[in-house]
Amino acid sequence: MTRSEALFEQAKKTIPGGVNSPVRAFNGVGGSPLFIEKADGAYIYDADGKAYIDYVGSWGPMILGHNHPKIREAVLAAVHNGLSFGAPTELEVQMAEKVIAMVPSIEQVRMVSSGTEATMSAIRLARGFTNRDKILKFEGCYHGHADCLLVKAGSGALTLGQPSSPGIPEDFAKHTLTAVYNDLDSVRTLFEQYPTEIACIIIEPVAGNMNCIPPIPGFLKGLRTMCDEFGALLIIDEVMTGFRVSRSGAQGHYGVTPDLTTLGKVIGGGMPVGAFGGRKEVMQFIAPTGPVYQAGTLSGNPIAMSAGLAQMEALCEEGLYEALSAKTKRIAEGFKAAADKHGIPMAINYVGGMFGFFFTEQEQITRFDQVTKCNIEHFRTFYHGMLDEGVYLAPSAYEAGFLSMAHGEEELRLTLEAADRVLARMKAAM
């Protein structure tokens, strides 16, 4: 038994399922999860001391790589001044100014402690601002575990949402409508059914929780047009894509302007941080300047702000995003080339510093229903093969992969060589 396996058995005695977030349990791929001892650059090290080239990056935040010296030094310096004050700090102001400078649609921003808190607060604000109750989300998109967001589509296009988890009253879920990602007709159908009741659309601009699904041309701008037509707000959930797809997020990359934006992951530099911001007219509706209540004991925590600021400043380096995109393209297209070489059907998607691959004969994946038809058994086999080769991918066929600036030529080469060997073994076993 490895030390990771022993720790997992020990953890299950005191922690539900042995983990503090379900995907970490390896239920999507089988086997026992790795327990991580440390991380540095492009590598993570498990409790047994084995090194892995990491394409999870703490689920997105580690865009510069693990244990980046500038972030580490900023955190250590901040710790000397105290861990938490429960009062305003200059660091919060600097972070707000940095976010606003990088994302043109954000005129004011509120710091929180997680992505879930950011989306939950943005939706409450949208409902308060519009005085409407219903929200519109998309099948396969994930915006955190708030009650109104853990909702799946009903049996028909016009059916009200149904809870996707026990513990969520149907009275909550009925206010959440679910449309088809990359399908404007499904959105218009819902708006025409509830023309004066929808407070907002919330969307992942690149859906990263059904693997990696970019928007088709015109989709995001079409949502903007419909929101304007029906008086709803557009919330772009950039918790995953913010400062990862481009310096101004996915909204900058695709040229669409939301009313509100939610952020997380990258802005924390590895610390627990979320944020929501947007038009000043809307943001002034939040307490203490407006009637919509939102608060948080650790919001704007000085240690988290220090880490986030250090990372955000580093991301302003000229040419960084072009280099990151080139690395991502090489990995995604390299996986595809290896699969083609061995006659294993695969489709790929990638944008900025995130990518996805699908074991499928479908040439292009643009919707959730296509993702569910992919070969999960092939993914599981490939996953464990890569893990044995020292490459750590997301342990779910429904999660995106992430590159960092720490992934160099050697890491990319070793990863693609490993993929070639694993796919060759898979083909031989068919």
UniProtKB/Swiss-Prot annotation:
It comes from the Bacteria. The modification N6-(pyridoxal phosphate)lysine is found at K265. Its cofactor is pyridoxal 5'-phosphate. GO terms for biological process: protoporphyrinogen IX biosynthetic process. The keyword Transport does not apply. Homodimer. This is Glutamate-1-semialdehyde 2,1-aminomutase. It comes from Shewanella sp. (strain MR-7). The lineage of its organism: Bacteria, Pseudomonadati, Pseudomonadota, Gammaproteobacteria, Alteromonadales.
